[in-house]
From Swiss-Prot:
<dbReference type="Pfam" id="PF06130">
    <property type="entry name" value="PTAC"/>
</dbReference>
<feature type="binding site">
    <location>
        <position position="142"/>
    </location>
    <ligand>
        <name>Zn(2+) 2</name>
    </ligand>
</feature>
<dbReference type="GO" id="GO:0046872">
    <property type="term" value="F:metal ion binding"/>
</dbReference>
<feature type="binding site">
    <location>
        <begin position="27"/>
        <end position="29"/>
    </location>
    <ligand>
        <name>CoA</name>
    </ligand>
</feature>
<feature type="binding site">
    <location>
        <position position="140"/>
    </location>
    <ligand>
        <name>Zn(2+) 2</name>
    </ligand>
</feature>
<feature type="binding site">
    <location>
        <position position="73"/>
    </location>
    <ligand>
        <name>CoA</name>
    </ligand>
</feature>
<keyword id="KW-1283">Bacterial microcompartment</keyword>
<dbReference type="GO" id="GO:0016747">
    <property type="term" value="F:acyltransferase activity, transferring groups other than amino-acyl groups"/>
</dbReference>
<feature type="binding site">
    <location>
        <position position="86"/>
    </location>
    <ligand>
        <name>phosphate</name>
    </ligand>
</feature>
<protein>
    <recommendedName>
        <fullName>Phosphate propanoyltransferase</fullName>
        <ecNumber>2.3.1.222</ecNumber>
    </recommendedName>
</protein>
<feature type="binding site">
    <location>
        <position position="92"/>
    </location>
    <ligand>
        <name>Zn(2+) 1</name>
    </ligand>
</feature>
<dbReference type="InterPro" id="IPR008300">
    <property type="entry name" value="PTAC"/>
</dbReference>
<comment type="pathway">
    <text>Polyol metabolism; 1,2-propanediol degradation.</text>
</comment>
<keyword id="KW-0012">Acyltransferase</keyword>
<feature type="binding site">
    <location>
        <position position="194"/>
    </location>
    <ligand>
        <name>CoA</name>
    </ligand>
</feature>
<feature type="binding site">
    <location>
        <position position="187"/>
    </location>
    <ligand>
        <name>Zn(2+) 2</name>
    </ligand>
</feature>
<comment type="similarity">
    <text>Belongs to the PduL family.</text>
</comment>
């Protein structure tokens, strides 16, 4: 048995053991996903965003570039851009950010932006006024098919997640997203992170709202 196979087996055993204790939770700060048209408008035709750091989800990354978002009441600077480029531009903030900006953003799943408020985006040289795309991301779990089978959950199922931190609580209305392209993590925003006393590496226990089939 070679070292690579041994390492792979150890990683799989560790993953399964951790899954028994729930899913790891990550807190996501405000960020934007840009489409090709918006990148061109903000940074120039054909501009390529600069990869800075990988995220936990395979193929997703933080870009070096930053922008500002402008609402009726205030401006938030140094907003992170996530890559790669999306089909439609989307801005994800917390409810607290929305209050500061003076815009009430609805709670939506990623990609569900029809009828949402717009917002002004500013780069160092240019601006883009979005007609829609501002949301508060619905809390969710990215999950691999193998982990979903182990947890006995299905695509788009709504579950509860119990967080045993310094301020233990149960998050309701958590949507499960399943794909072989995912890594298994729950994502909450900073408002939710503050509510549960979030610390890096904290885990959540999935509570099914319906009986497993």
């Amino acid at each position: 048995m070679n070292n690579e196979l041994i390492t792979s087996l150890i990683e799989e055993v560790t993953r399964r053991a951790l899954l028994e204790t729930g899913v790891e939770v990550e807190a996501s700060g405000r960020h934007v996903h840009l489409d090709r048209e918006t990148v061109d408008a903000l940074f120039g035709p054909g501009y390529e965003l600069t990869h800075f750091r990988d995220l936990s989800q395979p193929g997703q990354y933080v870009c070096k570039e930053r922008i500002s978002i402008v609402g009726p009441k205030s401006v938030i600077h140094n907003v992170v851009i996530l890559g790669p480029i999306r089909k439609k531009t989307q801005v994800e903030i917390s409810s607290t950010d929305g209050t500061a900006l003076g815009i009430k953003a609805p709670v939506r799943e990623s990609g569900d932006i029809a009828g949402t408020p717009g917002i002004l985006l500013l780069s160092a040289k240019n601006s883009v006024q979005l007609s829609e795309g501002l949301i508060v991301a619905k809390r969710h779990i990215h999950m691999t098919p193998a982990d979903a089978e182990k947890q006995q959950v299905s695509q788009s199922e709504i579950v509860q997640v119990k967080i045993n931190g310094d301020r233990p609580l149960i998050f309701d209305d958590v949507v499960v997203r399943i794909s072989p392209d995912f890594a298994t993590y729950m994502h909450i925003d900073y408002d939710e992170a503050n509510a549960c006393g979030f610390k890096k590496g904290i885990r959540g226990q999935i509570i099914k709202k319906t009986k497993a089939k």
